Amino acid sequence: MADFDNLFDEAMSRADGAIRGVMGTEAKVMSGTLSGATLVGVFDDPENIGYAGAGIRVEGTSPTLFVKTSTVSQLQRMDTLTINGRQFWVDRVGPDDCGSCHIWLGNGTPPASSRRR
C-alpha cells in the first residue's frame, strides 16, 4: 500500500478499493499500450438529458470509469475500451486522488481528429 500523508487519505484509499471490489465492472482495453489488459472499475453512464452547442463540454453527462490510478498510468487519449459489450474511447484521465481516478469516456469509436471536442 502507498504511503499517505494522513489517516484520512489512507481510509479513503481503502474505501475506494472496497467500492471497486464490490461494484466493479470489467473493462477490456482494445487499443494502445495497454491493449489486451482488463481494468476493473466502477462504470457510470449518466442519462444524457440535453445537448450543448458545438465546442461546449457539459461535465457530468459523459460516461466515466472509476479505477485504481496505478492500473491506468499508460492509458492514453483515444485508446478504446469495451465495457458491458459496448465500445468507448478515452477522452481524458483525471488526476490521482488517494490512489484512484476517473476516466472520462466517449461513446463508440474515437473521432477522426485527435483534437479535444
UniProtKB/Swiss-Prot annotation:
Pfam family for this entry, one: Phage_attach
InterPro entries: Phage_Head-Tail_Connect_sf (IPR053734), Phage_tail_attach_FII (IPR008018)
Gene Ontology cellular component annotations, sorted alphabetically: host cell cytoplasm; viral capsid
Alphabetic keyword roster: Capsid protein, Host cytoplasm, Late protein, Viral capsid assembly, Viral release from host cell, Virion
Transmembrane segments: none
GO biological process, one term: virion assembly
Gene3D superfamilies according to UniProt: Phage tail proteins
Subcellular location: Virion; Host cytoplasm
Binding partners and assembly: May bind Head completion protein and Tail shaft cap.
Stated role: Plays a role in virion assembly by joining the head and the tail at the last step of morphogenesis. Six Head-tail joining protein bind the DNA-filled capsid after binding to the Head completion protein, in turn binding the pre-assembled tail.
Protein name, as recorded: Head-tail joining protein
